[in-house]
Amino acid sequence: MELILGSQSSARANLLKEHGIKFEQKALYFDEESLKTTDPREFVYLACKGKLEKAKELLANNCVIVVADSVVSVGNRMQRKAKNKQEALEFLKRQNGNEIEVLTCSALISPVLEWLDLSVFRARLKAFDPSEIEKYLESGLWQESTGCVRLEDFHKPYIKSSSKNLSVGLGLNVESLLGVLKLGAKLSSL
């Protein structure tokens, strides 16, 4: 059965590739601006649910669809994608030397199964090097990432300690997803 990743995220696509999961990537448009909550957990759950509802429209094709959404929380203050360089700098200042949480809501829908998971990746960060912040802001890479968090490169050397579920921090709970895909395959064969 065909698997569709309903996300434009290159980090999510890379996670699936690294785990040998074949998929087709399609954008699902859901207006996150319509969500009025400022609570990070509620926001990421509602955004993922909204994407899941959009995914249901594609289910006539007898496929498996995976969607996800992530936000960053610093002291329970939500950080989404920065709108400009100034907001990106403010996000990084708040993260500097503090604990960050990447909240990821991952979901799957298929003709035989529906699954939703809300997980948290926590990282305690060291202080950022000011010259590296400037280089990072100039690179523009922050524009692709929620809360400007890039655990795979910019943030990586600053992680003092973290939880073990890195895939959640990168935007998709792949470990749980693999189990759900196996379960879905068993259910389909019944």
From Swiss-Prot:
Predominant subcellular localization, coarse grouping: cytoplasm
Keywords: Cytoplasm, Hydrolase, Nucleotide metabolism
A single BP term in Gene Ontology: nucleotide metabolic process
Catalytic function, reaction form: a ribonucleoside 5'-triphosphate + H2O = a ribonucleoside 5'-phosphate + diphosphate + H(+); a 2'-deoxyribonucleoside 5'-triphosphate + H2O = a 2'-deoxyribonucleoside 5'-phosphate + diphosphate + H(+)
Single GO term (MF): nucleoside triphosphate diphosphatase activity
Pfam families recorded: Maf (PF02545)
Active site positions: 69 (proton acceptor)
Gene3D superfamilies associated with the record: 3.90.950.10
Cofactor: a divalent metal cation
PANTHER family: BIFUNCTIONAL DTTP/UTP PYROPHOSPHATASE/METHYLTRANSFERASE PROTEIN-RELATED, BIFUNCTIONAL DTTP_UTP PYROPHOSPHATASE_METHYLTRANSFERASE PROTEIN-RELATED
Homology family: Belongs to the Maf family.
Function per UniProt: Nucleoside triphosphate pyrophosphatase. May have a dual role in cell division arrest and in preventing the incorporation of modified nucleotides into cellular nucleic acids.
Protein name: Nucleoside triphosphate pyrophosphatase
